Amino acid sequence: MSDREHLSSEPYKGVRDFYPDDWSKLTQVFATIRNTLESFAFEEYNASPLERAELYEQKTSEEIVSEQTYTFEDRGDRKVTLRPEMTPTFARMLAAKRREIPFPVRWFSIPNVFRYERPQRGRLREHYQLNVDLAGIADMKADGEIVVIAHTLMKALGAKDSDFRIRISSRTLLAAACAATGFDNEEAIRIYSRLLDKKSKLSIAEFESALGPTRSDPLKAIESGEDAKVAEEKKKLEDFIAALKERGITNVVFDPEIVRGFDYYTGIVFEIYDTNPENPRAIAGGGRYDNLTSLFGGDAIPCVGFAVGDVTLMDFLETHSLAPKPQASADVFIGTPSESDIGPASLFGEELRTNGLRVLVNKTSKGLGDQIKEASRRGITYFIAFGEQEAASGNVRVKTLESGEEIELSKADVSGHVK
């Protein structure tokens, strides 16, 4: 490589570099997520991003598998995929240890996932995705708890009920409506489900053309409720929504057009939508999937869960002015009037660290004025100039940089003041 040929400093298209301020904001959101889920007794898990490609070829959306996965052959001629989602991995892990782990399983993870798609607002080729799953309970009370957890998480992140809407439907209701309107096999229902999932992106004419002239739209069967099975499934869903409202979730609505794009859903499905017109999109989604573990042999394990991508979540938080600010890397900056003061100042810094403070000690030849500017630029709250006088007297002046206020304290009292 010649001197004129330099490597690009840009990241791969569609992925991000997280500089400290960016990572600080994201990790604060992750901390809120973890605290919320742990309050519901959920346990965190993780797995490798590399999976056998066949894991996704069975039940993941055909569009994702054929057009959006990073799939390749390794040096052992095995077909490998960078995970585009976590749910199949969760099902695989569940099936592998089903006789060893206690049920019901309450797990969550925040892995990075990969999809080869056109980068745009809310979509990148790599992102972090919260996955929350409850396995081993077939009763709809589990579905209710999952929706409650999703709602609680949004509130924990600072959102008001008016900021988002939970839109709910049911795959069993849709299947009943399809059967009532002549969609008489699974493949026909699957094709219609995929069409319905894209309806918001189509004109009325385009949707009706794709449906075909001989087909009656199952949505009309749901609306009328004349078919007995459709009416039965619709009543179950209405009762489910009523139970959520009794628990204080008032921003939940029935929306028969919600189907979710994955083939493995079998029951309740839901999406959380931003109500702000500046960001009209889904933030999160999930539902019940009772058959996915049967791909690995043995009886199916009933499961329900939801997922939230960090890109859409941060867009939501920023749209509603809820995004956290970067946290400072230190509580205290200890400045040194001269280079000879660095040693004693470092010892004082060690004392403060043993008391639980995060401390940055100047190691440069900068003047105190420049050190104060550095501390301010880093967002550090307190500044202490530590020279010969402070080392001899045992007292220091603690300056609050934002207000300029100073207070004199003994070295022993600094930790209590800063905390």
Model-derived segments and spans:
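Extended, charged alpha-beta segments that form solvent-exposed binding/catalytic grooves
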Residues: 2-251, 256-264, 271-279, 291-297, ...
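NTP/phosphate- and nucleic-acid-binding module
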Residues: 1-3, 24, 80, 236, ...
